[in-house]
């Protein structure tokens, strides 16, 4: 399974999930699903926004896990 590392990146940067939510143009429900890897798809524009806001390459936003959903 592939999951987003957004929460880990925020922690590394000393920022909060709420801070990121305020930067994104999403409803809180959709934002929360996305950062908690509870969604089956992510729009490219959201990946681009995450990459720019968190100042990291898109590839660093993901990690592969052995976990199956």
Model-derived features: positions:
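Short, charged recognition helix plus adjacent turn
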Residues: 8, 33-34, 62-69
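Short alpha-helical DNA-recognition segment
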Residues: 15-33
């Amino acid at each position: 399974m592939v999951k987003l590392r957004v929460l880990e990146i925020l922690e590394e940067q000393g920022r909060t999930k709420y801070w990121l939510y305020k930067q994104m143009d999403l409803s809180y429900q959709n934002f929360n699903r996305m950062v908690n890897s509870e969604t089956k798809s992510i729009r490219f524009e959201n990946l681009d926004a995450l990459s720019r806001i968190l100042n990291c390459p898109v590839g660093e936003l993901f990690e592969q896990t052995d976990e199956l959903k």
